[in-house]
Amino acid sequence: MAFITLRRAFCHKSILWIPGAVVALKIHPASHAPKAVTDRLSVCFCSLQPELFRVRFHHAYCKNFHSEKGNDFHPVGEPWSSQAQEWNQPGQSLQNEDEEMLFRRLSYFTSFEEVLSFISALDTLPVPLAMAALLRICEIGRRDGEQRLPEGVLENRAFQALCLRCERDPSHLTNAGLVTALQSLLTLLPADPQSSLMLSLVAECQRRLQRGNLEVHHLCVLGESLAMLQGASCETLKLVVRQLQSKSVETFAPEEITSVYRILQVCPEEVDKHQMFLNTLNNFSISVVPYLSPKSISHVLTALVALDQTHALPLLIKLGKYVVRYIPRFTNEELRKVLEAFVYFGHSDRFFTEALEQHVSALCFSLDPAVASSVMGYCSRKRILSKPIFDVVSEIVVCQWDRLSPSQIAELIEPFGKLNYVPPNAPALFRKVENVLCARLHHFPPKMLLRLLHSCALIERHPVNFMSKLFSPFFLQRLQGKESYLDRLSLAQLTQLFLTSVLECPFYKGPKLLPKYQVKSFLTPCCSLETPLDLHLYKSVVIGLIDLLGSRLYFASKVLTPYYYTIDVEVKLDEDGFVLPCTVDEDIHKRVALCIDGPQRFCLDSKHLLGKEATKQRHLRLLGYQVVQLPYHELELLTSRLELVDYLQRKLFSQSSAVHW
């Protein structure tokens, strides 16, 4: 809702329409005006004689007029051809034209020069016409993809005269023209909140706001402009929010719902004050979701994150349903915001994953690296092992590594280790990663480098050539930075890499990690390299073991080994295969480590262990433990205590006929 397009047409009436991000002045024959437009009659705009030049608003319900990305500046099928020459023929007098013809002529111009030449030729310049010309210039800049107007336009004397004329007396503008002008100028003019033009427009908006003359649509446009111009500290913005809260949410159009969320998003620290209004808004928005564009859905999800609306589950589910449909239509930035919101709210479903797989596979090498990083981050956080996505990403790293920044390389590679997936092109992938690290090692921040190499080790791609650098005092000092100590997660990753070098890389002869940098346990509350025990499954297994072994004395729980790992349940055996009491420390021939693996130790909805759990079990075997895995998907099939005991007996003792109890 940022720009005004003066549309070409031949008729008696004028309609100001708002397709998503563009306010467009479009002229239709009165007999053919769409009913959805005529039903939403609204405010006069920018007329020297308001009775001659009226405008109307319509909302985004009318899909025929909907401009999803806000860049449809002309009717479909009408080319952008300059019409300036026909207005410069001899015998025509600009001064004698009526007001409607002036606005109509302005709608034909397609360049800055045409608009400025037209304005320069006028003897008098009414405020409404000056504002329409100014907005036409802004719209041309937006159409041409300008981030701001060119310096040549800003320094043009006719343009400066336009700004001065609009600044002097904005009271002649209608509410729609005023708020739209403010929003439009913020987009392409230098963002100086103290400029006299901005101050004049804001002051006029404040006067009308205090009189209570602004409708919901005007409040939304004004609120977004004030948020952009002055931020959350703006008292006028708070007044806008209060007036919006006094309105009936049920009368809000879809684009107005989106605007309200964006306005509230600017003030997350005041969310408690607005929570009742937000609850009403969240509940009503469920019915509006089908009418939202992909851009609006992305905006709403972003606002829900900023406002921490984790309890708005029905709205999130409805938004998620439509996100699945719109994935190919999202821009890269919008899709990133959607993924961030889904991670924040913990939302995932197989339909979204399938749609994401299709989208990534279809784009393949044209997939934007930033989007690829966001997709992999989403899969990693949600523990979603999507082989189609991971395979495409591995090919992107191999073939387009020179397009990737160090942070993107790390973000794309780390999920492979976390989710314990080795792609089909693993030799080429990790050879490329090694080459990149050799060439650009100093471009990787210390913690990022450590995370990257640690994730490689989780899938047995051991960074032997870099271990000496990781364990060197110089790197450890860089890793610590200005802090007084190294964070525990970094120490745990270093310790596990050191243990890996000892157990899996006996040929490594470089520096060792000093004991003062080694953690005592990988299982810690905030930064664990092990997944905590599932207590429900643990209690079931304990009951079964007591029935099987005859006493709680014959097994120990949550045993911390000298090698930093914590074993869920440990059973000790002597040389003859007899089960020993857990308190005995002599004559132990074998230790059995029972891994009670709950759902959190696997990738989502699969039987595929996470990288850290697979590494733990691999290391325990190398340390001499007999590892017995008790996965949740097997335990949940047991329907009786007798079945549980029989299951544990088979798991514990089928591997050795010499075991007794």
Curated annotation (Swiss-Prot):
GO biological process, one term: mitochondrial cytochrome c oxidase assembly
Main location: mitochondrion
Tissue distribution: Expression detected in spleen, testis, colon, heart, smooth muscle, kidney, brain, lung, liver, brown and white adipose tissue with highest expression in testis and smooth muscle.
Domain RAP intervals: 592-650
GO cellular component: mitochondrion; nucleoplasm
PANTHER family in UniProt: FAST KINASE DOMAIN-CONTAINING PROTEIN 3, MITOCHONDRIAL, FAST LEU-RICH DOMAIN-CONTAINING
Free-text domain note: RAP domain is required for FASTKD3 function in mRNA stability and translation.
Function statement: Required for normal mitochondrial respiration. Increases steady-state levels and half-lives of a subset of mature mitochondrial mRNAs MT-ND2, MT-ND3, MT-CYTB, MT-CO2, and MT-ATP8/6. Promotes MT-CO1 mRNA translation and increases mitochondrial complex IV assembly and activity.
Similarity annotation: Belongs to the FAST kinase family.
Name recorded for this polypeptide: FAST kinase domain-containing protein 3, mitochondrial
Gene (name only): Fastkd3
